[in-house]
C-alpha cells in the first residue's frame, strides 16, 4: 500500500457574493479532487484544537498525525530545523518576517514576496549590524527568516503574526509583556539598517514594496517528537517549499525532498513537486505534498489568484498523482485537504473545520459525494473528525 497526502494550504473559504454565494472551491474547476471525493469517503476535519491559534504550524502538525496538545511548542523552532539551525535547551527561535511599513502601518507582511537572493543580503546585513550575544539572524526563503535568542529571552513575549494585522498601525502591535521592549527595540533598529539599503532602494525604483522592517513572532523552544515510523509504522517524505512543513517532517523523521523552483507562491514548480512525489513513493510508504500558493492568495485577498492556485493544485499536483495511482499495480490511498481556511474576505486564517476526501484505488463503497468543497463533503460518511486522527484512519481505510 502506498499513501499520498496532498495539502492545498488555505484552500477553504467562505461563500462569496461575486461567485453567486459559492466558495472558491465550489466555483473552481477541480476535476481531480472531485473525482477523489466521488469515489472515496469525505468529511470535515478539525485541524485546530480549542485553545490554539489557527496557524499553519498547528494545523499541519495535526494533519501529519501529531496532536498539538502533546507536541506543539511554537512555529519558529520547526522552521529552524528545516534551516539546519540547532537549538540549545535555552534557545528561543522566532520567525523573522521581512515586511513593508508605510506611513506607520504594516502594508505588506511579505515585502512584495521578496526574492530569496535579495532577502539573504538583507538578513546577512542585519546579522552583521544587530547580532549580539543575545540574538542571531539566519536567512530563509523569500520573506521568511529566523532569529534565535539565547538564555530564554522572549519565551513569554506576546507577539502577533503580521499577516493578521495588514493595514494596522505597527505601534499598536509591537511585542508586549516580558522582553517585549527588547524585541520592539530590535524591530525599530532594523528599520534604520534596512530603509536605505541598496537592495531596498532598487526595489523602490522598480515599483516594488521595500523590505524596510523585520517583524518577530511564532517563537518557541525545540519540540520533542516521536518519529512517524514509531507512531504509524510507515516510512515517508515531505515535499514543500516552506521551512515550517519541512521542519515538521524533520522532527517526524521523514525525508525532506528538495524540489528546484519550489517557491511557496503561484510560480512554484508544480510539475517538479508531482514528479518528486511519484519518485519518492518508489522507496517509501507515504508522501506529503504541500502547496502554499492558495494560502498566500488568501492573505492577499485575491479571488483571482486563489482560484488559479486551487485550479493549478488540482491539475498539476492532484491530477498527475491520481493518474499514477490508478495506473499502478500497487494499491494507493490518497488524502486531499487544506490545512485551514484562509478566506479572502478576512485575509487570514480561521479555525473552521476543513473539507477532506480519502480515496483508495481498490475501494468498492464510495460515499458518492459529487464534488470536493466545504459543503458537499458534509454529505460524506466520515462526519467531523479530529485531524490528528486522520493519518491513523488513512492507514486503516
Curated annotation (Swiss-Prot):
Lineage: superkingdom: Archaea
Pathway: Carbohydrate degradation; glycolysis; pyruvate from D-glyceraldehyde 3-phosphate: step 3/5
Secretion signal span: none
EC category name: isomerase
Reaction(s) catalysed by this chain's protein: (2R)-2-phosphoglycerate = (2R)-3-phosphoglycerate
EC number from the UniProt entry: 5.4.2.12
Molecular function terms, GO-annotated: metal ion binding; phosphoglycerate mutase activity
A GO BP annotation: glycolytic process
Keyword Isomerase among record annotations: yes
Residues forming coiled coils: none
Family designation: Belongs to the BPG-independent phosphoglycerate mutase family. A-PGAM subfamily.
PANTHER family linked to this entry: 2,3-BISPHOSPHOGLYCERATE-INDEPENDENT PHOSPHOGLYCERATE MUTASE, COFACTOR-INDEPENDENT PHOSPHOGLYCERATE MUTASE
Function: Catalyzes the interconversion of 2-phosphoglycerate and 3-phosphoglycerate.
Protein name as catalogued: 2,3-bisphosphoglycerate-independent phosphoglycerate mutase
Natural source organism: Methanosarcina acetivorans (strain ATCC 35395 / DSM 2834 / JCM 12185 / C2A)
